[in-house]
């Protein structure tokens, strides 16, 4: 019996689409009502989560879709997972939900156990965790940690603040509010808050009308595919982009205190960074005393066939901070140097300091991934799925450009000639029973849960071939 069958013996055997259009009439009706109190314009359909199960999401019209988007890559184990339901019904969860603690001042007696459970899933080389509330919050907290660390190295870790620092910071001025930058990359997505938004550079709609920090955006490598046929050209691309990074660090108008990168830019188009590129960034950050942050918000927790995508690069020495959220349901960053803990309390602080209810779920997710060997399964299924997609690429090369993600689990994407054609394909896929997402201008990205198996891949490939023929 497969892992999916163990979890979901009553999972549907295939998608069922009952309506002629999506969203269907009942979804449209209820979305109109919901629209009175919530912005429903981005909605695909109105979901019925009580009826959704495993790898299938159901809407209020009774349509059941094979879900390869999984709540924008945030559902790790499928819908209504029994292990997570068990964790949700625990006394610890009830306490966390009913009497949510202000952890900084009033930590619960079980917090040590909860955090140590999360740390079982920490990336190699990381043994501390700082909790947050969302992916954007995780990155904002990481930036704060980086700035505090950077200034502590200049001033002395145990040194007190000067009177000038205490006075100037109240006017948002230096030296108390130092002029420092975070370097990110073009096409990056790190969140929609103010600092994270300043490092985001994927679509104008994410940033318009918001004041932003004047921080540098370097070039992220754009590889030619297949990778094994373009190794020389791609190495030149890596070196070109690395030279830009180093030049920006040396010449930017204010000091670059930190660098943040996604090992695969997800929202920006599923752009991959090579092992060589990620390691060379480590060399550069060490050379210029820059904090190295890996954003694993979307790539983390198993979808690439490893628990953390950057582990493919085996970066040495380990990066300074690794941010997480999405599939872990909780959020925060991992680190290993205790000096990233501020020298005084209340510097990295808020009322909640994370959410114990979500931390409990994160610990349960990590345990299930480990016990069921779900990263190994994801790697196996991803290889199977990629070979099937290569077959479609040979048959329809125009509609499967730059197929990428080989050897990266089910974290797979490809491009269509235009955004309009991509959007039409996604629409056809829904009508043929598959919920799939796009990214960037004309890319299709696959983000199924870790319980997605070969039988699901076969269903998807059949629906995809049919949808492409209908374009």
From Swiss-Prot:
Induction: Subject to nitrogen catabolite repression. Expression is low in the presence of the preferred nitrogen sources, and up-regulated by GABA.
NCBIfam families, sorted: GABAtrns_euk
Subunit structure: Homodimer and homotetramer.
Subcellular location: Cytoplasm
Protein name listed in UniProt: 4-aminobutyrate aminotransferase
Cited function: Required for the degradation of gamma-aminobutyric acid (GABA), which is important for utilization of GABA as nitrogen source and for oxidative stress tolerance. Deaminates GABA to succinate semialdehyde, which in turn is converted to succinate by the succinate-semialdehyde dehydrogenase UGA2. Cannot transaminate beta-alanine (BAL).
GO BP, one annotated term: gamma-aminobutyric acid catabolic process
């Amino acid at each position: 019996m497969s892992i999916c069958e163990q979890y979901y013996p009553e999972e549907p055997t295939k998608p069922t689409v009952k309506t002629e259009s999506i969203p269907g009439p009942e979804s449209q009706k209820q979305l109109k009502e919901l629209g009175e109190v919530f912005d429903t314009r981005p909605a695909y359909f109105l979901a019925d989560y009580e009826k959704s199960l495993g790898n299938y999401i159901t809407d209020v019209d009774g349509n059941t879709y094979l879900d390869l988007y999984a709540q924008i890559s945030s559902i790790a184990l499928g819908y209504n997972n029994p292990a997570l339901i068990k964790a949700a019904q625990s006394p610890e969860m009830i306490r966390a939900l009913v009497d949510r603690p202000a952890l900084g001042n009033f930590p619960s007696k079980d917090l040590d156990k909860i955090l140590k459970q999360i740390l079982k899933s920490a990336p190699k080389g990381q043994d501390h965790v700082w909790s947050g509330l969302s992916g954007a919050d995780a990155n904002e907290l990481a930036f704060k940690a980086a700035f505090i660390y950077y200034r502590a190295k200049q001033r002395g870790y145990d040194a007190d603040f000067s009177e000038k620092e205490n006075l100037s910071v109240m006017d948002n001025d230096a030296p108390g509010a130092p002029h420092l930058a975070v370097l990110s990359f073009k096409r990056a997505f790190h969140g929609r808050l103010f600092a994270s938004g300043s490092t985001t550079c994927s679509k104008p709609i994410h940033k318009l009308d918001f004041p932003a920090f004047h921080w540098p955006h370097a070039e992220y490598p754009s590889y030619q595919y297949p990778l094994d046929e373009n190794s020389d050209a791609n190495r030149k691309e890596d070196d070109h982009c690395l030279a830009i990074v180093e030049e920006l660090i040396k010449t930017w108008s204010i000091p670059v205190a930190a660098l943040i990168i996604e090992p695969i830019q997800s929202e920006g188009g599923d752009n991959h960074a090579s092992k060589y590129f990620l390691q060379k960034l480590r060399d550069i950050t060490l050379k210029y005393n820059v904090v190295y942050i890996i954003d694993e918000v979307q790539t983390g927790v198993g979808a690439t066939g490893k628990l953390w995508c950057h582990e493919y690069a085996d970066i040495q020495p380990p990066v300074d901070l690794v941010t997480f959220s999405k599939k872990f349901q909780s959020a925060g960053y991992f680190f290993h140097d205790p000096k990233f803990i501020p020298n005084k309390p209340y510097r990295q602080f808020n009322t909640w300091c994370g959410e114990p209810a979500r931390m409990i779920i994160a610990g349960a997710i990590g345990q299930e991934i480990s016990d069921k060997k779900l990263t190994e399964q994801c790697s196996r299924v991803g290889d199977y799925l990629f070979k099937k997609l290569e077959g479609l690429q040979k048959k329809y090369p125009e509609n499967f450009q730059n197929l990428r993600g080989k050897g990266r689990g089910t974290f797979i994407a490809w491009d269509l000639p235009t955004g309009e054609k991509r959007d039409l394909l996604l629409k056809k896929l829904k009508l043929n029973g598959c919920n799939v997402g796009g990214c960037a201008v004309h890319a299709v990205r696959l983000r199924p849960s870790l319980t997605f198996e070969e039988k699901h891949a076969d269903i998807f490939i059949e629906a995809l071939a049919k949808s492409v023929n209908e374009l």
